[in-house]
């Protein structure tokens, strides 16, 4: 998976949140969405992303939440297959 070409992920200090920038505006990401998207680099698989997040946040069962968010992001056109 990778970010779609028209989007740029950026930490927005004024918003105190990760945002997706695109030509027409900005999407403020809630919760762990930014943490997930920072791990999308065109090389990691979904399982790699889940494993990386599990290491960063031990004790949390994140797999289904990550998969649900990735499906949402794909449906919105924020991410695309490599």
Predicted regions and their residues:
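Long, charge-rich, low-complexity alpha-helical segments
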Residues: 25-82
